[in-house]
Curated annotation (Swiss-Prot):
It comes from Oryctolagus cuniculus (Rabbit). Belongs to the 5-formyltetrahydrofolate cyclo-ligase family. GO terms for molecular function: 5-formyltetrahydrofolate cyclo-ligase activity; ATP binding; folic acid binding; metal ion binding. GO terms for cellular component: mitochondrion. It holds the Pfam family 5-FTHF_cyc-lig. This is 5-formyltetrahydrofolate cyclo-ligase. Substrate binds at L56, E61, R148, G149, R150, G151, Y152. The keyword rRNA processing does not apply. Contributes to tetrahydrofolate metabolism. Helps regulate carbon flow through the folate-dependent one-carbon metabolic network that supplies carbon for the biosynthesis of purines, thymidine and amino acids. Catalyzes the irreversible conversion of 5-formyltetrahydrofolate (5-CHO-H(4)PteGlu) to yield 5,10-methenyltetrahydrofolate. It can also use 5-formyltetrahydropteroic acid (5-CHO-H(4)Pte) and 5-formyltetrahydropteroylhistidine (5-CHO-H(4)PteHis) as substrate. Its cofactor is Mg(2+). The keyword Oxidoreductase does not apply. Its EC number is 6.3.3.2. The lineage of its organism: Eukaryota, Metazoa, Chordata, Craniata, Vertebrata.
Length: 201
């Protein structure tokens, strides 16, 4: 019964957050994006990380393009998610350059990602990750995260623990509209180390 209550609470919170995200103006999106990019670039954890995984944004997520460009400018190694649709399996595969993104095929969710037949270095096979930037629909101040319900990141972080013996540092990028008093969680949900967002103008 408890599990059903949690999944019901997650469902209704997801619907509410999607609505809140749709209401954010284009100007506000740009403002948050710029300020968050600056916050990330100045962040100690980012500066000391060499192998970084970052998501390519969906329309209702913080745009990560400028951060990706900076990762390459700083000579760091960039990995992006390759989701296996119809499953909860995801790999973090190496990106050769920021310019390469636009030439990658698009998934049914309209996100660029390398195809399954495109052989690329997977982060965990070549030394793990120092830092993972996490997408999500909602977060609370304790780092609890509400994803889109597929479990890709929770499953991947478990793999990191098994294969590199430690969880990479995790930072969520969010609009303040995504910060909730409390996110409903269960045992499989992995919390994030830090949620970065921008306060009201």
């Amino acid at each position: 019964a408890a599990a059903a209550a949690v999944s019901g609470a997650k469902r209704s919170l997801r619907a509410e957050l999607k609505q809140r995200l749709r209401a954010i103006s284009a100007e506000e999106r740009l403002r948050c994006q710029r300020l968050l990019t600056q916050k990330v670039i100045a962040h100690r954890q980012y500066q000391k990380s060499q192998r970084i995984s970052i998501f390519l944004s969906m329309p209702d997520e913080i745009e990560t393009e400028e951060i990706i460009k900076d990762i390459f400018q700083q000579g760091k190694v960039c990995f992006i998610p390759r989701y296996r649709l119809q499953s909860n399996h995801m790999d973090m595969v190496k990106l050769a350059s920021a310019d390469e993104i636009s030439s990658l095929p698009k998934t049914s969710w309209n996100i660029h990602q390398p195809s399954e037949s495109d052989t690329r270095e997977e982060a965990l096979a070549t030394g793990g990750l120092d830092l993972i930037f996490m997408p999500g629909l909602g977060f609370d101040r304790n780092g609890n995260r509400l994803g889109r319900g597929r479990g890709y990141y929770d499953t991947y972080l478990q793999r990191c623990l098994q294969q590199q013996g430690a969880k990479p540092y995790t930072i969520a990028l969010a609009f303040r509209e995504q910060i909730c008093p409390q996110v409903p969680v269960d045992d499989t949900d992995v919390s994030v180390d830090e949620v970065l967002y921008v306060d009201a103008a």
